[in-house]
Every structure is written in C-alpha cells, then in structure tokens.
Amino acid sequence: TRRRPAALLDNPECLITLRNEDDSLFGGIAPEPSSKNLEKVRKVLDESKSEFRLGAIFDPDGDRIRFYDGTREIDMNQFGALAFHYMATWRKEQGCVAKSVATSNFVNIIAEKLGVPVMETPVGFKNFRPWLSRNAKQKALVAFEESDGISGLNNTLEKDAQFGLLIALEIMAVTGKNLGEYLDALYEEYGRFYPTRSGFEVDKSLVGAPLKAKVDAIATIAKPGAKVMVGKNEKTVKQLLTLDGVKIIFEDDSWMLVRPSGTEPKVRIYTECRNPDEKDPMFEAAKALFFKN
C-alpha cells in the first residue's frame, strides 16, 4: 500500500509521502498508526501555511489509519463518528452504523439524535460483516473500531485505510472544513468524550475460563439501577452489555468495559467519561469491581 494513495489520487503535487521506501524492519519502529509515529507528519503539516491540511499514517498492510490536520491528532474514536455524521447528514445515506463494544459512544449519541440504529459488536472487525456485505438488509454507512480500523458503504468487508483516507478528503472537499473544524462543530452540538484504554495483570492461574468467569461476575453486581462509586461521585448504571466482557453504561453516558484476555493473565479496561478529570477514577472503579467479586 506504500504507493497506492498517490495512484488513487493521480499523484497530485500537494501530496507528500513519507516512509514509502522498502524497509522490512520499518525503520526500527513499531509498524502501527500511533501517536508517536505521527511525529514526522506533524512536523510537515505544522510547517505548512495551507488553508486545508490533512496528514494520515497507515500501518504496513494498509488496514488501519490515523489522522492529523495541522492542529490535532484525530483517532478512530473521533473520525468514525465524524465520518458517520457526514454520511448521514451531508450525503444523506440510509442505513446503520456499526462499532465495537470497546469503541467510543460518541457515535451512539450522534446516531440517537439522527434516528439511526447502532450495531454494537464484540471486538474484532469480522463482526461487522453482516452490515458490510452486499446483500445486507441494513447496510452500515461506516463500521469502525477504536484500534483505527474502518470500512463502510459499498466497500470491502475488511478494515481499509484507503477508504478512511478517501472519506476524509471527501469530507474536506464537500464541507470546506478541516477535520478538526468539523469535529469542533460536533463537540459543540453533542459535547466531548474522553476514551481511554489500559489494563493490569492477574495471577497466571486465572488464564482462560477462570478469568472470563471472574469478569462475567461483574454483571451480577452492576445491573441497571445499581450505584457505582467513581472517585467521590456515585454513578447510576443505565445499561449493561455483555457482548464481549462487561460494559457498564452510566446515566451520564460515561462507561467502563472490562474484558479478559483469552491467552494472557491480563484484564483489559476501556473507559469513557464526559469530564477528563474522571479518567483515572473510572479506571480505578472498574478495577475495584473486578476484585470485588
């Protein structure tokens, strides 16, 4: 995929490519679209005076993508919601939106207001196939996961960084806004969301079924209506999802997801809050629920 974007876009003069040479060791860095790997893109765009700017990094096999617009990094939690809003409001496409249970609920809030159904799935892009297939009764306008994978309407069943890039460019061309400007407009209307991902190790004896059982037990003490202390605040459980681990959604639309690793003695925790000061308390509260049972 190194030279595919240039070919797709007919080699425009405004396109600058980085790291497109053959290198089986990837320059000694982890081959992924991470914040750290955006540094060279940031440098190029920060020096640009152009009105419209878009930077993107792919992983080597071209299935994941992350953006930078000259002002901020935009990950898939944000871009997926942004792309869905564009497809539903500017292009006026009909269908649903698909996302994994570990992905930001930013898109849920947008979809609810627009009257569009959300298909929330276990982690893993293969789970989006029922809404990406050509004969789907209800097609996903976009399907995305927090680990920077996206696909969508009339595209491949697999995550596709090039689809993400083309949608981003279309958004800019049609709306006349950089991605960050579009995102700010959504924040103004729907509020901000602060997702995080972390985890911790447990005793090796818990690997496999015992660890899954311990995580599943959280559902028995965090049912809808239950109270959970998050820092100094008491939150009320609004909804409980057990598609993949246990996801607890609170009345203020913040949430926590506790998932067991299937192969390692690790527990993965995903949280999202509406106030950045709650990031650490949310993680500690999720961890406390795991050790409570």
PLM regions and their residue ranges:
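Phosphate-binding chemistry for phosphorylated carbohydrates and sugar-nucleotides
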Residues: 1-192
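Catalytic-core signal marking the mid-to-C-terminal active-site face
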Residues: 177-293
